[in-house]
From Swiss-Prot:
Mode of membrane association: Peripheral membrane protein
InterPro entries: Sec13/Seh1_fam, WD40/YVTN_repeat-like_dom_sf, WD40_repeat_dom_sf, WD40_rpt
UniProt lineage: Eukaryota, Metazoa, Chordata, Craniata, Vertebrata
The keyword Protein transport is assigned to this record: yes
Phosphoserine, modified sites: 184, 309
Keywords of this entry: Acetylation, Cytoplasmic vesicle, Endoplasmic reticulum, ER-Golgi transport, Lysosome, Membrane, mRNA transport, Nuclear pore complex, Nucleus, Phosphoprotein, Protein transport, Repeat, Translocation, Transport, WD repeat
Listed name of the protein: Protein SEC13 homolog
Phosphoprotein as UniProt keyword: yes
Main location: membrane
Cross-referenced PANTHER family: NUCLEAR PORE COMPLEX PROTEIN SEC13 / SEH1 FAMILY MEMBER (PTHR11024), PROTEIN SEC13 HOMOLOG (PTHR11024:SF2)
Organism the protein comes from: Rattus norvegicus (Rat)
Subcellular location: Cytoplasmic vesicle, COPII-coated vesicle membrane; Endoplasmic reticulum membrane; Nucleus, Nuclear pore complex; Lysosome membrane
Length: 322
């Protein structure tokens, strides 16, 4: 059984939509309909407010930490159609960049693996996905995938930089030939896989169809070097699917139904070793799932938060969400 190790009183004045631990598990970022982003030091079970970031003009849906090799950087996205990138300099958090290239709510932000540099994917209700790449001296290059999802994009998640099968296939000392990929989920009930071509343009590689309602979240599992790629998806239809691909071409994906919940499922998140999946939904519960030896997914923990958002507490099983 997973126990709650800390409960953080964020003092947000409205619903909390996301809560993310940083790389080291010492800082917690939260965002809310009160238009604010807050950062807490949560070491040793404490909760010290480090920053209260104001810059959005609408509900803030999601936050994402960049890899610490680039400093303390946090991205946030909002109903106000903006993405803001915040950076800590000399102990003070400030806005370092604002992206206003979408025509509707920006629902999801996700940093690429650090091996690629500072690249942020952003999914919007206008149906487009934008990719922001830091080019140095405060400048960001923007690429846009228009009409990525009809009606809107709800979630983006990068594939790991580790090449599938590299643990057993990669010649010693040879640098892997990385191919940038990410997954997206949208209001067209689809999961789409995208890859960067040699000319730098992004191409739709695959459509994954299984959900019967809006896809609310997608999460590409971390790679541990084995020759399998795995993606989790969840939907307004209450279902969570685990998608696996074993072939080198990356074209043959097979879905397995993890569970059919009685309410919308908002988020899915992998443990850092990719063997446990956290699922949170409209029933105010976080459930943890693990694949058994016979290939079936079983619930190993059911944490009922009672009243309030499921994002407001941190459990041991979710600390390595990033």
């Amino acid at each position: 059984m997973v126990s709650v190790i800390n409960t953080v009183d964020t003092s947000h004045e409205d619903m909390i939509h996301d809560a993310q631990m940083d790389y080291y598990g010492t800082r917690l970022a939260t965002c809310s309909s009160d238009r604010s982003v807050k950062i807490f030091d949560v070491r040793n079970g404490g909760q010290i407010l480090i920053a209260d970031l104001r810059g959005h003009e609408g509900p803030v849906w999601q936050v994402a930490w960049a890899h610490p090799m680039y400093g303390n950087i946090l991205a946030s996205c909002s109903y106000d159609r903006k993405v803001i990138i915040w950076k800590e300099e000399n102990g003070t958090w400030e806005k370092t960049h604002e992206h206003s290239g979408h025509d509707s709510s920006v629902n999801s932000v996700c940093w690429a693996p650090h091996d690629y540099g500072l690249i942020l994917a952003c999914g919007s209700s206008d149906g487009a996905i934008s990719l922001l790449t830091y080019t140095g001296e405060g400048q960001w290059e923007v690429k846009k995938i228009n009409n990525a999802h009809t009606i809107g994009c709800n979630a983006v998640s990068w594939a790991p930089a580790v090449v599938p099968g590299s643990l057993i296939d990669q010649p010693s000392g040879q640098k892997p030939n990385y191919i940038k990929k990410f997954a997206s989920g949208g209001c067209d009930n689809l999961i789409k896989l995208w890859r960067e071509e040699e000319d730098g343009q992004w191409k739709e590689e695959q459509k994954l169809e299984a959900h019967s309602d809006w896809v609310r979240d997608v999460a590409w599992a971390p790679s541990i070097g084995l020759p399998t790629s795995t993606i989790a998806s969840c939907s307004q239809d209450g279902r969570v699917f685990i998608w696996t691909c074993d072939d080198a071409s990356g074209n043959m994906w097979s879905p397995k139904l993890l569970h059919k919940f009685n309410d919308v499922v908002w988020h899915v998140s992998w443990s850092i070793t990719a063997n446990i999946l956290a699922v949170s939904g409209g029933d105010n519960k976080v459930t943890l799932w693990k694949e058994s030896v016979d290939g079936q997914w079983v619930c190993i923990s059911d944490v009922n938060k009672g009243q309030g958002s499921v994002s407001a507490s941190i459990t041991e099983g979710q600390q390595n969400e990033q």
